[in-house]
Regions:
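Glycine/proline-enriched, intrinsically flexible loops and inter-domain linkers
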Residues: 1-85, 90-113, 117-569
Length: 569
């Protein structure tokens, strides 16, 4: 029986969301690395004492599925009696937490009130380097997680707010950029205890511990009820979707990802059991992030205003077969999981769209990445960037450019000024790739291009996935294009790579051109509004040849569209 009235529940829920936002703002402002303060590859959340999410407002929705497993990972090794007020725990092991790969480290802080653990605050953030063969710990040659850098089961990062000496020594000796790793972790831990725990304690002082913990349960039940109410309106049945991700071990092999959205009354089950067996290479993805993606898709289809909390997990089930790409067995590598997760997002949305009877959305582009680290005796750094590409088109609108897959839409491109001021590179080109967006009545988001001039010997890792299976169009729309990495383009020693690569040696003066993939289009290109075609042509989004051959514009119209307007005297 609820002891907190509905109005108080909603006030407490809003306060929890505010606390999460404030924690995230603190991490952003105090983080050391560009991956935190520029790319925004981090989040924060609040769980109850069992690890059920009660507050999360993340720019990266899959993190919703990660925090329960991270807290449970800590509880697997530490009892409540072994915790003290001000302790912070650190974990990154993909098979003992919700962390998708070792680069993502989570800080977990138990919140004490009246002498007992009442909740946990947690923050996940990508780390620039945690050791391993390649700078940035991005290694396509990894055949187990031990080749992907430092693996940490739960350990103390702070003991009663005092840095844990042994943990800090461990981190310093296993990173090319220890000051960034420890600095970012300090930002996360500081946000949790100085804002998260402090605000939660004040909330419980104000409303009472029992009322707040009761509200934790009630706001989850309300989310569950709302989701079930809408699912019950859908037609019972099985709705399937599939897509592909490229294997890293065999670049000519596609791995099939499959989902069945099963609607049964007010219950939705997403069954991924027909997905291909796991790869030997680091393209596999552990279940927690896929679950988070499922919850995010359900919210998007039902009501974007639904609070993110454990009620989603009670209304949406996920089923996996062990030993598949989406549920690999220990110690299978998972370092490039995000390249697979972009396809997972596409097929989940396709299946749920069918179940909900809503128009399909073209597949999103898979965002690329740039990781460059110095070698030899020069200034030591690891340059880590996310290259956010384009969204898929939908019936009624073009896909956005420069946002990447929707689940990473809260991440951002690092500015040219920051890159050139902090790393030994010069940006020679930053532009959109003409004719890249999947053609259609509604065009897919375009690919991005960046060219870097290297100013000291370095090693490169990154690229774009889905070379064999670019983002799919829908309803007659065309597919997007694949991405590529070209070393010294246009020169006699030009080298072009597709897919994901690592450990590519670069010399001073080399030029690296990175082009991301692009998103699919929706509808027949010949049905695209003529004014939209002309505007795309004038903006350089499409070429005159494409305007004529693909969109049906006459050569005269194309020429006229690009003719300079007469000056008005």
């Amino acid at each position: 029986m609820a002891t907190t009235d509905v109005i108080s529940q909603e006030v407490i829920r809003a306060r929890l969301d505010g606390i999460v936002r404030e924690m995230q703002a603190a991490v952003l402002r105090t983080g050391f690395s560009t991956i935190i303060r520029e790319s925004h590859d981090f989040s924060a959340g609040i769980t109850d004492r069992e690890g059920n999410v009660v507050g999360q407002f993340s720019p990266l929705p899959p993190h919703l599925g990660a925090y329960p497993e991270c807290v449970k990972g800590v509880l697997q090794f530490y009892t409540y009696d072994q915790m003290s007020d001000g302790d912070c725990f650190l974990i990154n092991h993909p098979y003992y937490s919700g962390c998708p790969h070792p680069n993502d480290m989570v800080v977990v802080l138990p919140v004490f009130h009246q002498g007992k653990v009442v909740a946990f605050c947690a923050s996940m953030g990508h780390k620039s380097d945690i050791g391993g063969q390649s700078p940035g710990s991005r290694n396509t040659l990894a055949r187990d997680v031990f080749g992907e850098g430092l693996q940490i089961m739960p350990v103390k990062f702070l003991s009663e707010r005092i840095p844990h000496k042994e943990t800090h020594q461990l981190l310093r000796s296993n990173s090319r950029t220890p000051e960034l790793v420890i600095g970012d972790l300090g930002a996360q831990a500081g946000a949790l205890w100085s804002i998260g725990a402090y605000r939660l304690k004040k909330l419980m002082d104000e409303y009472g511990q029992d009322s707040v913990t009761d509200a934790f349960e009630q706001i989850g039940l309300r989310t569950e009820a709302r989701v079930r109410q809408v699912i019950a309106e859908w037609k019972d049945g099985v709705y399937e979707a599939f897509g592909y991700t490229d294997d890293i071990v065999d670049p000519n092999k596609k791995l099939r990802l499959h989902v069945s959205a099963i609607v049964n009354g007010d219950r939705l089950t997403l069954d991924f059991s027909q997905t291909d067996p796991q790869s030997l290479g680091p393209i596999n993805a552990r279940p927690p992030f896929t679950k988070g993606m499922a919850y995010y898709a359900a919210i998007a289809m039902i009501d974007p205003g639904i609070p993110n909390n454990f009620g989603l997990a009670r209304a949406v089930d996920c089923v996996f077969n062990e030993g598949t790409v989406l549920n690999p067995t220990f110690p299978t590598p998972v370092g490039f999981y995000s390249m697979t997760l972009s396809t997972v997002e596409d097929i989940i949305f396709e299946a749920i769209s069918k179940a909900a009877g809503k128009p399909l959305v073209a597949h999103n582009a898979s965002s690329g990445m740039v990781v460059m680290g110095t070698v030899g005796g020069g200034r030591r750094y690891v340059q880590y960037e996310l290259m956010m590409s384009g969204n898929g088109a939908y019936d009624g609108g073009d896909g956005w450019t420069g946002t990447g897959h929707s689940w990473g839409g809260g991440s951002k491109l690092t500015s040219v000024e920051i890159l050139e001021s902090e790393f030994d590179v010069e940006l020679r080109n930053f532009s959109l790739v003409s004719d890249s967006g999947g053609a259609g009545e509604y065009r897919g988001g375009l690919a991005l291009r960046r060219e870097y001039v290297i100013q000291q010997p370095s090693r490169y890792a990154g690229g774009s996935p889905r070379n064999l299976s670019p983002a799919q169009g829908v309803g007659g729309g065309l597919d997007g294009i694949a991405g590529s990495v070209t070393i010294n383009p246009g020169s006699t020693d030009e080298q072009k790579y597709v897919g994901i690569i690592s450990n590519i040696m670069l010399e001073e003066g080399d030029v690296v051109r990175v082009e991301t993939g692009s998103a699919g289009g929706a509808g027949d290109p010949l049905n695209r509004d003529r004014l939209r075609v002309i505007n795309d042509l004038r903006n350089g989004y499409i070429s005159p040849q494409s305007a004529v051959a693909t969109y049906g514009l006459s050569e005269e119209q194309a020429t006229q569209a690009l003719s300079p307007k007469p000056e008005v005297i």
